[in-house]
């Protein structure tokens, strides 16, 4: 499941609220005409070689194109990601995200962030939306 993989790789070290927020960003993108209209296409969005493999560091979510294995190693964390993904897909969402379509960790300061509206910081992630 694409959404669960994204939660696992992007936020498994975050509290539940942070994991839900990462999932909600994907769903918000699906509902935004600037992005693909399904979860897997949003998660795997980026530049790809003709072979279909992602180009290193040229995708929306860093885990997908960092050159490392995308296999899950922590089964308990992956199962929890699956649970969160299912709940978010079934419509569980939280108003505190206010349409967030972007986030990054507190360890980086991407140039795109200055053009977005800050919404909230949840643990190690900062969330934004188009302004």
Spans of features found by a protein language model:
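Bacterial extracytoplasmic/cell-wall-associated proteins, especially those involved in peptidoglycan
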Residues: 1-131
């Amino acid at each position: 499941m694409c959404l669960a993989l994204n939660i696992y790789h992007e936020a498994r070290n975050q509290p539940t609220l942070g994991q839900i927020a990462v999932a909600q960003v994907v769903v918000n993108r699906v509902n935004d005409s600037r992005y693909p209209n399904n979860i897997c296409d949003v998660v795997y969005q980026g530049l790809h070689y003709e072979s279909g493999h992602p180009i290193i560091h040229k995708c929306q979510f860093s885990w997908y194109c960092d050159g490392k294995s995308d296999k899950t190693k922590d089964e308990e964390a992956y199962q929890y990601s699956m649970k969160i993904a299912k709940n978010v897909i079934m419509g569980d969402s939280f108003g505190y995200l206010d349409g967030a379509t972007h986030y990054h960790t507190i360890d980086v300061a991407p140039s795109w962030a200055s053009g977005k509206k800050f919404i909230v910081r949840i643990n190690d992630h900062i969330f934004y939306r188009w302004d």
